[in-house]
């Protein structure tokens, strides 16, 4: 997969039914002064697992859009997932989610989303 060769991860292999969560708030580009300088945190059951900044991303949003547009048609209003913030993957820390865990993701100037892990 070309995404893996470009350090994009298995991008097209990460989206499954019911796997994408949005909200409670989304913002448009004009609402953020600088999307490349936002504090981002991940907490599991109240414990901080990741505290980083959007300035650690490998690819700018314009680069991601250009890459996706090579093989797919994008329409106004579509949402593009940009991946995991630096050091935000549990595998990097040898820590994994369990059934019942509460995952909170927070992005400065946007808000917090909280979800419970449910094993199917």
Which role does the model predict for each range below?
Residues 2-120:
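Catalytic-pocket segment enriched in acidic/His residues
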